[in-house]
From Swiss-Prot:
The gene is trpA. The alpha subunit is responsible for the aldol cleavage of indoleglycerol phosphate to indole and glyceraldehyde 3-phosphate. The keyword rRNA-binding does not apply. Gene3D superfamilies: Aldolase class I. Belongs to the TrpA family. This is Tryptophan synthase alpha chain. It is an enzyme of class 4 (lyase).
């Protein structure tokens, strides 16, 4: 039985640089397999209010994102995936990818790629791969089956499957039926996120074939309520749940 992936998200430099580094320095020991770092865009159309708030705080306080990214890669060994919007960089994608490469990050995830740029997505995937950066593709239940299947063959580290329209927003869904459907279509590593709101949700996802979970909103809420230590304790708890499968 292979280990289930725990993918942890944190907005770059949140809540401040020192606490962000404290979070980074401890996540491997607490069981995180892949780190997602959010770079604030001007318009975060697919993020919920909790993550949008962090973007506003960080964009007001931090100017050089790439220095921090480089430092992150000096501190941890697990893969680092940047999450931001293609819309923000579509006219300067080459420069952006070069800066990511110089920062030594491993991959990039554009949640808007297969939604707003679906007619050109293969071109952008090739540009990313040609820079030696891994592509993580985001899919969702309303996407056509053939697009999801194609994305599963192009994605590198894992296929991200968002079960709700935005992060941290509770909409009644049948998680097990959604994952059952996509599991029959794809052979790639399947990580489920974008709206897992409870341990019960996570257990449902694991029991029907998900290879891991991505958690972000709840980590930020823990940081806000209980500091970095609270977020690390949540990671420890989630690792324990995943290890049951």
């Amino acid at each position: 039985m292979s280990k289930k992936y725990l993918v942890a998200y944190m907005t770059l430099g949140y809540p401040n640089v020192n606490d962000f580094y404290k979070f980074i320095d401890n996540i491997e020991d607490f069981g995180v397999d892949i780190l997602e770092i959010g770079i604030p865009p001007k318009y975060a159309k697919y993020d919920g209010p909790v993550i949008r708030k962090t973007y506003k705080i960080v964009s007001n306080n931090i100017k050089n994102y790439y220095e921090i990214l480089y430092e992150v890669k000096q501190r941890i060994k697990i893969p680092v995936v940047i999450l931001t919007y293609l819309e923000e960089y579509v006219d300067k994608l080459g420069d952006f990818l070069l800066k990511l490469k110089e920062s030594r990050v491993d991959g990039v995830l554009f949640p808007d790629l297969l939604i707003d740029y679906v007619d050109e997505y293969e071109k952008y995937v090739n540009l990313i791969k040609n820079e030696g950066i891994k592509t993580v593709l985001f899919t969702a239940p309303l996407m056509p089956d053939d697009l999801i299947i194609k994305a599963s063959k192009l994605t590198d580290l894992f296929l991200y499957y968002g079960v709700r329209p935005t992060t941290g927003v509770v909409i009644p869904i049948s998680i097990d039926s959604l994952i059952n459907r996509i599991r029959t279509m794809v052979q790639s590593k399947l990580v489920v996120g974008f709206g897992l709101n409870s341990i019960e949700d996570i257990k449902k996802a694991m029991s029907v074939g998900a290879d891991g979970i991505a958690v972000g909103t709840s980590l930020i809420e823990e940081v806000d309520k209980n500091g970095v230590n609270g977020a690390l304790e949540l990671i420890k708890k989630l690792r324990g749940v995943l290890d049951e499968y």
